């Protein structure tokens, strides 16, 4: 495909126009009095949202240079969302301010590379200041306040705080759509995975269609079990011990399955067979997780273990196992605490190293099953449009709360950024680097000014007043009052604020140092087709 190329000021201004188009659509949502944006969908009802990254993803511009500019800012929003789960609008507003001030200085003759170095040093200093002033999240109320601000609803904040209190910071909190109105919280005790019994005959409670095994042995096998002779030596040892048996294998079929079922029906021996969760390598990993949790070993030819020679010492233990047709829950596995902690650290390292959102999500689920628990928030609403918007808000708020627990909180409402700017006066920079630091200083005011503007206040007046207030005090845009924001429960996770600034500065530096833009040449629209009837009017068909 043919390309078009723009240089110097033309290239940078084209990118800036794209950035501004996207940022102007996103920034109207900032703050407690921010508005919503309606997004048209090709299929189904339109989406109404105030989430920066969702809005950014939908924007496609026609001009090739503007399109590239918008794509670069989308990257800011997406990266911030990936790292912190919130702060996408703040990141976009900061990027716009940094680029606007930066391009003004480049046009006036400043060296872009000098500005870039100055911006990087200034951002490093502000980040250190934010981390230094962050307050640890110690109470349920602080988590509720942080999540409530993100979701724009204190009830959601309280529910998320309740969920985090129950499952711990390593636990997984998922959000599901509900057919009923309002919000519900469901908690899972122990490790649960989405595979149920292979045969209904294993159920111990016919009415509830579930099998409950008290103090069972747990056999983990990485392959299929089809012949009973493989299983018999081990079954005899378990029967002698007088305990029930849970078998988790790739599959249990044929005479092995029928033998287990017949013994269960006759009351000779209580057992349940379940297929192992996941597929391929993920199945192996999950079996290993269950083995560590229950203190057993996975019987696998890869490690030289076979069913015929397996002894009772290879079996795991748990206080209780509950199996339904759809899922299995293992309560209080008898695994060694140090081994479980080691496995948790290993999974955590894999999460850090992974660059796939899907893999990270699956690893996080495994981590929760081992270290914490799983809470499900069920959200309902009157219409599908409202339901999707509400679900999205809750998901963002959950990630926001987790970020707060991780690195602490700072004053919200753009105040922490503005009140961190004096640290830049201590930097001993000269020339274009000093100008770069000043660009950051100006940009740090942008989020607060936008929040004030969205609340119908005069941005410049608000920024000047907040600058002279004690640290942590600022504008409560919801009420229009100036107060101690942390005491009032208006806070942001420092991880969100820090990520927004770092990602915005990264993209702004790329904008300023760009000297040429190569884009696809827009294709001309095809000429309309002629009249298939050849212009012969008046004919009946």
Swiss-Prot record:
Superkingdom, natural source: Bacteria
Gene Ontology process terms (BP): protein refolding
PROSITE patterns (alphabetical): CHAPERONINS_CPN60
Residues bound to ATP: 29-32, 86-90, 413, 476-478, 492
A Pfam family the protein falls into: Cpn60_TCP1
UniProt keyword list: ATP-binding, Chaperone, Cytoplasm, Isomerase, Nucleotide-binding
Its EC number(s): 5.6.1.7
Catalytic activity: ATP + H2O + a folded polypeptide = ADP + phosphate + an unfolded polypeptide
InterPro entries recorded: Chaperonin_Cpn60_CS, Cpn60/GroEL, Cpn60/GroEL/TCP-1, GroEL-like_apical_dom_sf, GROEL-like_equatorial_sf, TCP-1-like_intermed_sf
Compartments (UniProt record): Cytoplasm
Chief location of this protein within or outside the cell: cytoplasm
Any one GO MF annotation of this record: ATP-dependent protein folding chaperone
Entry annotated with the keyword Zinc: no
Functional summary from the UniProt entry: Together with its co-chaperonin GroES, plays an essential role in assisting protein folding. The GroEL-GroES system forms a nano-cage that allows encapsulation of the non-native substrate proteins and provides a physical environment optimized to promote and accelerate protein folding.
Family of this protein: Belongs to the chaperonin (HSP60) family.
Oligomeric form and interacting partners: Forms a cylinder of 14 subunits composed of two heptameric rings stacked back-to-back. Interacts with the co-chaperonin GroES.
Protein name as annotated: Chaperonin GroEL
Native source organism of the sequence: Rhodococcus hoagii
